């Protein structure tokens, strides 16, 4: 057997096989299995841009701006705080996003794409097609884009895990009780948009009241929560408004309901005007009416030319929305009508556009872009790529011939690690190091638990637990972490392998030793090949948001929160991609291994700490015990007859006995005939956590 990967000959399903980077992936055996002609696909999408349909005619004969808005609004729901939202799942097809006011008429964009999706079928996801359409739209209008990666996977129902806000109505003002703001306009975490139903800021101004400087403050918060800095904010705002127009040449009161509320005969289309003509020049979407630039189907620097060459005044659109229009503009600088080139109209700016002119920091950047069109094009192309790929995960997940070669810091780059080394020899060195089971398991867990299935960031690969900011996180117990790393790093150096591999291998060894102490001989699967990230290629501010505020698996809360400890555990469980039964078995195992944060004894329902037994579940479900509050969210476990305190516990521990679903799992693991199943299931879930970010093994 190759020593590149370890396997057990036991009865556990997880012990047989296990992919390693040294084995052939499916693509090596069947390299043509993807079978998507990407060049032909791009040609079809490009042709779509100028193939205007009578049922929803293209502005100026070009659908580019509509496709860009669709892609922008798909990707723009991403928020860095929890990694949720974004364009990697095609969630714009479902409620609530398909019916948000800010997404009005994007249902038409997706219907225009349907013939292409129908043609290519399963070879491309809706998520990929939506983002590709926006990127190709820019290319068709003259922008040299930075690149594009396939690899997004569709979901097939509305997402239930995303908190979009507490409001009960669309576009509720921030002054209304129960909203998303508190204090001095402090936006609730993890939200990024300023209103329910918007992607980012209100284009008319804060709560619909024009004031560019106030809007600039909203923009800075919103874009920062989308992982964008000031330069990227200016580039995206200006680049997004270089092409296309707003639609408000009509009466918004005549629009029908959104797609989710539309009549069955409307077949999923919303905002239909069944009273008057509501297409072309008469379409109503945001209520603002007009184009930003003189040539709305051409990539150029016209946005900055108009913004800075003219004074602007507030006016109302035909639909009654606030917008800015130029004073004394030359006729030749006006964009032509979307249907009749003999007619010209005033261009417009939103309050967000005017923020680029009035906010001092934004203006500096905008003036630089105005003077250097090439710099603007490059900055926008990079920002657009980041916007549309931020939630796609590391570069190893990118698919296709248009992937840019350059590694970008926001991709959290990790170099490839070695796979050709003697795993058993390294494990022997770790075993001789004197580290405890608790130290080995806790360190590996802390390294891996940062993984988020939402945007596929974090995880053990890269061993960023040894770098800032993670090496100072309270949840990682910095003093203990430093002591453990002082032992493991020399082992990695002596073996010329990554610290990341050694950390995980040490955790696996700890689990094996604990299983042996419980009377079960197993070998935890291990796949070498992790690399070590560098501090220089780690964006500290970007990683700050991955800091755990609580970890139910290690029975720890950083401080008191409005939500319960068990709710925080469920949120982390969902982000890590774990199921209810995996959560259950991991908590029970981690407790008996003595991995509680700070060495607390809460929930350690065993007299055999360090042995991977099912004692936690046996004692949790034992009716000889009673449970009593003891203050500060803690509980005592007492003998029912004597009243003697046997253990202490937290709400996290009690929920596995009180919740009917979790108790059902707990009872399974408490059974006398499931002691080995408990070990096997723990190892399976453990292995899933340790390899959650090993996308190189999933190709």
Curated annotation (Swiss-Prot):
It comes from Aeromonas salmonicida (strain A449). Its cofactor is heme b. NCBIfam families: cat_per_HPI, PRK15061.1. This is Catalase-peroxidase. It is an enzyme of class 1 (oxidoreductase). Signal peptide: none annotated. Bifunctional enzyme with both catalase and broad-spectrum peroxidase activity. It catalyses: H2O2 + AH2 = A + 2 H2O; 2 H2O2 = O2 + 2 H2O. SUPFAM superfamilies: Heme-dependent peroxidases. Binds 1 heme b (iron(II)-protoporphyrin IX) group per dimer. The active site is at residue 73. The record marks 69 as: Transition state stabilizer. One of its GO terms (molecular function) is metal ion binding. Belongs to the peroxidase family. Peroxidase/catalase subfamily. GO terms for biological process: cellular response to hydrogen peroxide; hydrogen peroxide catabolic process. Formation of the three residue Trp-Tyr-Met cross-link is important for the catalase, but not the peroxidase activity of the enzyme.
């Amino acid at each position: 057997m190759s020593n590149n990967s370890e396997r057990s000959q036991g009865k556990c399903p997880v012990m047989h096989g296990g992919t390693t980077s040294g084995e052939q992936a499916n693509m090596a055996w069947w390299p043509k299995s993807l079978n998507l002609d990407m060049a032909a696909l791009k040609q079809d999408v490009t042709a779509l841009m100028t193939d205007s349909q009578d049922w929803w005619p293209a502005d100026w004969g070009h659908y580019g701006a509509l496709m860009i808005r669709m892609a922008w609004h798909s990707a723009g729901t991403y928020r860095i705080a929890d990694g949720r939202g974004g364009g990697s799942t095609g969630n714009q097809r479902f409620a609530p996003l398909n019916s948000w006011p800010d997404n009005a008429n994007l249902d038409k964009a997706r219907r225009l794409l349907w013939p292409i999706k129908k043609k290519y079928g399963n070879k491309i996801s809706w998520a990929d097609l939506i983002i590709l359409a926006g990127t190709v739209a820019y290319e068709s209008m003259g922008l040299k884009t930075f690149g594009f990666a396939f690899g997004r996977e569709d979901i097939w129902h509305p997402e239930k895990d995303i908190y979009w806000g507490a409001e009960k109505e669309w576009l509720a003002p921030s002054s209304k009780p129960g909203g998303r703001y508190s204090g001095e306009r402090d936006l609730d975490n993890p939200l990024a948009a300023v209103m329910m139903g918007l992607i980012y800021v209100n284009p008319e101004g804060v709560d619909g009241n024009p004031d560019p400087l106030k809007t600039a403050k909203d923009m800075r918060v919103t874009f920062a929560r989308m992982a964008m800095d000031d330069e990227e904010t200016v580039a995206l705002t200006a680049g997004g408004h270089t092409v296309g127009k707003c639609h408000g040449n009509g009466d918004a009161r005549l629009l029908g309901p959104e797609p989710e509320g539309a009549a069955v005969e409307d077949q999923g289309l919303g905002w239909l005007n069944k009273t008057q003509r509501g297409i072309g020049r008469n379409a109503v979407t945001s209520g603002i009416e007009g184009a930003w630039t003189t040539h709305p189907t051409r990539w150029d620097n016209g946005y900055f030319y108009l913004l800075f060459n003219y004074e602007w005044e507030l006016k109302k659109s035909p639909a009654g929305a606030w917008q800015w229009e130029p004073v004394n503009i030359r006729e030749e600088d006006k964009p032509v009508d979307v249907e009749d080139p003999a007619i010209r109209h005033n261009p417009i700016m939103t309050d967000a556009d005017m923020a680029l002119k009035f906010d001092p920091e934004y203006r500096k950047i905008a003036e630089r872009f105005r003077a250097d069109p090439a710099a603007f094009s490059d900055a926008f192309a990079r920002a657009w790529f980041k916007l549309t790929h931020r939630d796609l995960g590391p570069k190893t997940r990118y698919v296709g011939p248009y992937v840019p070669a350059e590694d970008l810091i926001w991709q959290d780059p990790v170099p490839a690690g070695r796979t050709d080394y003697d795993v058993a020899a390294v494990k022997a060195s770790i075993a001789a190091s004197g580290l405890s089971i608790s130290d080995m398991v806790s360190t590996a867990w802390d390294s891996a638990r940062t993984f988020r299935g939402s945007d596929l960031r974090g995880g053990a690969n890269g061993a960023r637990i040894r770098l800032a900011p993670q090496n100072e996180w309270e949840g990682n117990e910095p003093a203990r972490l430093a002591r453990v790393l002082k032992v493991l790093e020399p082992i990695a150096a002596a073996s010329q392998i990554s610290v990341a591999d050694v950390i995980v291998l040490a955790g696996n060894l700890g689990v094996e030793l604990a299983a042996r102490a419980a009377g079960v001989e197993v070998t935890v699967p291990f796949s070498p090949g992790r690399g070590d990230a560098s501090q220089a290629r780690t964006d500290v501010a970007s990683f700050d948001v991955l800091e755990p505020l609580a970890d139910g698996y290690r029975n720890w809360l950083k401080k008191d929160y409005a939500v319960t400890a068990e709710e925080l555990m469920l949120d982390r469980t969902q982000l890590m991609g774990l199921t209810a039964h995996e959560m259950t078995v991991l908590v029970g195992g981690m407790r008996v291994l003595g991995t509680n944060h700070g060495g607390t004894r809460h929930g350690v329902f065993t007299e055999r700490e360090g042995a991977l037994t099912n004692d936690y579940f046996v004692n949790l479900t034992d009716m000889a015990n009673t449970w009593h509050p003891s203050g500060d969210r803690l509980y005592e476990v007492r003998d029912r007859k004597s009243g003697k305190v046997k253990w202490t516990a937290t709400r996290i521990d009690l929920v596995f006995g009180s919740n009917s679903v979790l108790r059902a799992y707990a009872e399974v693991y408490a059974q006398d005939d499931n002691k080995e199943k408990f070990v096997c299931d723990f190892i399976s879930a453990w292995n899933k956590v340790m390899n959650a970010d090993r996308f190189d093994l999933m190709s």
